[in-house]
């Protein structure tokens, strides 16, 4: 294995090496410093004359007298079922004090998008225990559904709650969570580790933690490490995997940092022009494969800089993924948790995972009616700000009250409150009962008579009388 002393330039986290024999893109590199210490790196770019190497541990102390050795290997993850219950660094090394993982297989982390011909359409409901998601923006197996948040909003709490509570319905269905956090502080890392251990959620999870002071290149590896683990567990052990990636904004910032160090021509707002393609290599690894029992579902979480949904990161994410869940600063200011604004939120594949055989027969029409009633109530708030509530009709006041109760009772729930889908749907019917039946135009009469609280109470009365007599 040849060693080279042909470093010509060190720029930020990058080292430029000349006159090398052909090397592979993504190849691992060992750099030996004059004092004998070593650093690891990865080939980022190759050309006829120059190889660009990104150094994992930073380039402090690296100079033109340092020695570069190309290993002939690429970044791989030690994959094993023993990963479940472990907390790993962003580069896949154990940081929980436990033993190293003995690999059943070492897999390249680059992976590949699923062959479109082999893809199976996402179906079946995943229950998160959060009413605003399960009822109004349902997550289905094989979907990629991002959460658009803002700085200071409780997206980390929501991520932890989903990781604790997420489950698939049906006997014999095994489920696990892969949780990958990128660019987080020590405080956040401590919170994640303690929460997973305290609640017992770690038993069915693999956690990857990349800290803010870790190298930028590791931030680019972390989601790929997580997805490689997900693919192994899903397709080798038939598990249904939910991958939670937070915060993809930190990932994109690392991508921009490395692009700037390489002196590439910037795209929108300084991000590289290939960011769309790069994000697609992550998001498109979710899905279902025909003939395989296991599935991979993704929930990437990102903070929108300046709460701007047109910013390149949420904008490009929205093009690739199948919907979005939007957090609201206004709801957060009201003390509502989780502050999910259901009106701009959307799950494009929701129709494939709800209804008879999945959740409940009334769910699709129930959802349409809930959206319509809440949207009308929110519109009326704007009118009240101009003319005052006294100018509203009795009907309008009912819709205004519905919107308030919807946020207070339906959207708001405890951080450890795990609601099943039946509870969520019944709660929605209780709210719809505030409105006159003639206003429930999006629900068939048979569902009103079956699930409306007024009719359910009538059905319950004979049973209550029998119990009292006995």
From Swiss-Prot:
Membrane topology: Peripheral membrane protein
Highest taxon in the source lineage: Archaea
Location in the cell: Cell membrane
InterPro entries per UniProt: ATP-synt_VA_C, ATPase_a/bsu_AS, ATPase_A1-cplx_bsu, ATPase_F1/V1/A1_a/bsu_N, ATPase_F1/V1/A1_a/bsu_N_sf, ATPase_F1/V1/A1_a/bsu_nucl-bd, P-loop_NTPase, V-ATPase_su_B/beta
Keywords for this protein: ATP synthesis, Cell membrane, Hydrogen ion transport, Ion transport, Membrane, Transport
GO molecular function: ATP binding; proton-transporting ATP synthase activity, rotational mechanism
UniProt record, GO biological process: proton motive force-driven plasma membrane ATP synthesis
GO cellular component, one term: proton-transporting two-sector ATPase complex, catalytic domain
Covalent S-S links between cysteines: none
This protein's record includes keyword Oxidoreductase: no
Function: Component of the A-type ATP synthase that produces ATP from ADP in the presence of a proton gradient across the membrane. The B chain is a regulatory subunit.
NCBIfam families according to UniProt: ATP_syn_B_arch, PRK04196.1
Family: Belongs to the ATPase alpha/beta chains family.
Binding partners and assembly: Has multiple subunits with at least A(3), B(3), C, D, E, F, H, I and proteolipid K(x).
Protein name: A-type ATP synthase subunit B
Species this chain originates from: Archaeoglobus fulgidus (strain ATCC 49558 / DSM 4304 / JCM 9628 / NBRC 100126 / VC-16)
């Amino acid at each position: 294995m040849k060693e080279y002393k042909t470093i010509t330039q060190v720029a930020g986290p990058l080292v430029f090496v000349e006159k090398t024999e052909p090397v592979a893109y993504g190849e691992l590199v060992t750099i030996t410093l004059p004092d004998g210490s070593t650093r690891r790196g990865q080939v980022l770019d190759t050309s006829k004359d120059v190889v660009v190497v990104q150094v994992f541990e930073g380039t402090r102390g690296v100079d033109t007298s340092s020695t570069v050795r190309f290993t002939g290997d690429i970044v791989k993850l030690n994959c094993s079922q023993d990963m479940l219950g472990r907390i790993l660094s962003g580069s896949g090394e154990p940081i929980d004090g436990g033993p190293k993982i003995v690999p059943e297989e070492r897999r390249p982390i680059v992976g590949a998008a699923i062959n479109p011909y082999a893809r199976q359409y996402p179906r079946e409901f995943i229950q998160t225990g959060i009413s605003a998601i399960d009822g109004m923006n349902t997550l289905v197996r094989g979907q990629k559904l991002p959460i658009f948040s803002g700085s200071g909003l409780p997206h980390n709490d929501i991520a932890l709650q989903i990781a604790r509570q997420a489950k698939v319905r049906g006997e014999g269905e095994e489920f696990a969570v892969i949780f990958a956090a990128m660019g987080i502080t020590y405080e956040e890392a401590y919170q994640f580790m303690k929460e997973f251990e305290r609640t017992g959620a770690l038993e069915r999870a693999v956690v990857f933690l990349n800290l803010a002071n870790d190298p930028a290149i590791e931030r680019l590896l972390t989601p790929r490490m997580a997805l490689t683990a997900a693919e192994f567990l899903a397709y080798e052990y038939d598990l249904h995997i939910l991958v939670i990636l937070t915060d993809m904004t930190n990932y994109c910032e690392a991508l921009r940092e490395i692009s700037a160090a390489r002196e590439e021509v910037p795209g929108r707002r300084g991000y590289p022009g290939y960011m769309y393609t790069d994000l697609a290599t992550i998001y498109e690894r979710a899905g279902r494969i025909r003939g395989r029992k296991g599935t991979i579902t993704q929930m990437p979480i990102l903070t929108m800089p300046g709460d701007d949904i047109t910013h390149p990161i949420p904008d490009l994410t929205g093009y690739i993924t199948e919907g979005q869940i939007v957090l609201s600063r206004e709801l957060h200011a009201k003390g509502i948790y989780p502050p999910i604004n259901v009106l701009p939120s959307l799950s494009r594949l929701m129709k494939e995972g709800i209804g008879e055989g999945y959740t409940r027969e009334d769910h699709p029409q129930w959802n349409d009616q809930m959206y319509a009633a809440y949207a009308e109530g929110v519109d009326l708030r704007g009118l009240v700000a101009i003319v005052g509530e006294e100018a509203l009709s009795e009907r309008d006041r009912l819709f205004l009250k519905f919107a308030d109760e919807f946020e207070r009772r339906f959207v708001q729930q405890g951080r450890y409150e795990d609601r099943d889908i039946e509870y969520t749907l019944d709660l929605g019917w209780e709210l719809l009962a505030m409105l006159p039946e003639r206003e429930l135009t999006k629900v068939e009469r048979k569902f009103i008579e079956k699930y409306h609280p007024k009719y359910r109470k009538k059905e319950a009365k004979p049973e209550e009388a029998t119990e009292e007599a006995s």
